[in-house]
Amino acid sequence: MKWETVIGLEVHTQLATQSKIFSASSTAFGAAPNTQASAVDIALPGVLPVLNKAAVECAIKFGLAIGATLNRVNVFDRKNYFYPDLPKGYQISQLAKPIVEGGALTIVVDGVEKTIHLTRAHMEEDAGKSLHEDFHGMTGIDLNRAGTPLLEIVSEPEMRSSAEAVAYARALHTLVTWIGICDGNMQEGSFRVDANVSVRPLGQAEFGTRREIKNLNSFRFLQQAIDYEVRWQIETLEDGGRIQQATVLFDPDTGETRMMRSKEEAHDYRYFPDPDLLPVKLDEAWIDAVRTTLPELPAAMRTRFQQDYGVSAYDASVLTGSRALAAYFEAAAQQSGQPKLAANWVMGELSAALNKAELDIGESPVSAVQLGTLITRIQDGTLSGKLAKQVFEGLWEGAGDVDGIIAARGLKQMSDAGELEKIVDEVLAANQKSVEEFRAGKDKAFNALVGQVMKASRGKANPAQVNELLKAKLQ
């Protein structure tokens, strides 16, 4: 039997506000336990929540960016459950009337575009953190995270493979960091993914029983967890077993998922409107004011890069992987006037150096202006591509500016016709066997002669001129 995978993602995005969603406590990461937990956060009797306006504006910005419907009146609800890191005994969330409904993101997998629709995005507060390994025989509770503003973004179950799920998660990560509503730091828990996974016989309309994989904090783990879960569900069904709806955890060490608890439904949480919070009303003036803060979005920029700079759809997608990367490329392209060459250098030499040094584009020792100048020197014939890589290494090491490194290291390309002709004549005289082989129809002999000329010129000869001279003399 052939099976079809069905995946929907729920992503908890920590909103980039200075204070929590219902209190004035700081959201800064890494503080000593319980030093950023106010009376509201620890649920002392008599305290009341006050909604953070900045968190609402982050949600509005996201809704606008995905072309969603913004509910002009949205309501906060209490989600009731007991857990030690939830001091109130309930979490403030949104169920019936979330702030964002609908919208879509476009992903590309193996060169094929696909639109993934979103169900909703709602605001809620984060819980605290249980510290199981910090105390012998006990569990500590850190409430610094309690009350941190989250936007939970729920997709439709429209992904059919782990590759599509990862592409969607990456696109969403790019978007929320691009528009500035989340720092995207997965190691610190700013972007956490829950994957709802089920399988069904190919062609069946009805969904299978889903299991939810919780708190995946890397794209690699997301792919591994889904792949394992799909294999497990198919094997279970083919062996005559049944899938029980459940919440599971992924163990990166074993590469397996394990059951955490049976999966709850909405009625298990006894949702009801929070009486301490009034409905949030969004007027057009407020929405329009937030709209003016939106930057050019990734999809629009991809289209513009293809139209204005002539780069391919794939290159445009890579170059808009982050707002900082897109800005770097555009600055280098404008500095050099050679956008395609700039794209090749950004995605090639620069990207490799950044990955090797484990640096982000914003930490690059080579500025966009420097790279643009380097590309200009290739274009005007001062440097060959091979020599340019040596100059790039110098820029990376902080050895000076482009022209200074060229001069100091004697890297200027040899373009003097008389000087080149002399070297070519010497190479032809010393390599008569290769000359005879070329004239006998062996094209590889020509490449060998080019190599000898480049070697004799210590890599400084202009390759195009070398080719022309050799062809002229070998006719």
Swiss-Prot record:
Q: Which HAMAP family match?
A: GatB (MF_00121)
EC number(s) stated in the UniProt entry for this protein? 6.3.5.-
MF terms in GO: asparaginyl-tRNA synthase (glutamine-hydrolyzing) activity; ATP binding; glutaminyl-tRNA synthase (glutamine-hydrolyzing) activity
Keywords attached to this entry: ATP-binding, Ligase, Nucleotide-binding, Protein biosynthesis
Official protein name in the record: Aspartyl/glutamyl-tRNA(Asn/Gln) amidotransferase subunit B
Q: Which family does it belong to?
A: Belongs to the GatB/GatE family. GatB subfamily.
Q: How does it assemble?
A: Heterotrimer of A, B and C subunits.
Q: Which InterPro entries match?
A: Asn/Gln-tRNA_amidoTrfase_suB/E, Asn/Gln-tRNA_Trfase_suB/E_cat, Asn/Gln_amidotransferase, Asn/Gln_tRNA_amidoTrase-B-like, GatB, GatB_C_1, GatB_Yqey_C_2, Gln-tRNA_amidoTrfase_suB_CS
State any GO BP term from the record. glutaminyl-tRNAGln biosynthesis via transamidation
Reaction(s) this enzyme catalyzes, per UniProt: L-glutamyl-tRNA(Gln) + L-glutamine + ATP + H2O = L-glutaminyl-tRNA(Gln) + L-glutamate + ADP + phosphate + H(+); L-aspartyl-tRNA(Asn) + L-glutamine + ATP + H2O = L-asparaginyl-tRNA(Asn) + L-glutamate + ADP + phosphate + 2 H(+)
Q: Where are the transmembrane segments?
A: none
> What sort of enzyme, by top EC class, is this?
ligase
Function of the protein:
Allows the formation of correctly charged Asn-tRNA(Asn) or Gln-tRNA(Gln) through the transamidation of misacylated Asp-tRNA(Asn) or Glu-tRNA(Gln) in organisms which lack either or both of asparaginyl-tRNA or glutaminyl-tRNA synthetases. The reaction takes place in the presence of glutamine and ATP through an activated phospho-Asp-tRNA(Asn) or phospho-Glu-tRNA(Gln).
Domain of life, source organism = Bacteria
Matching Pfam families: GatB_N, GatB_Yqey
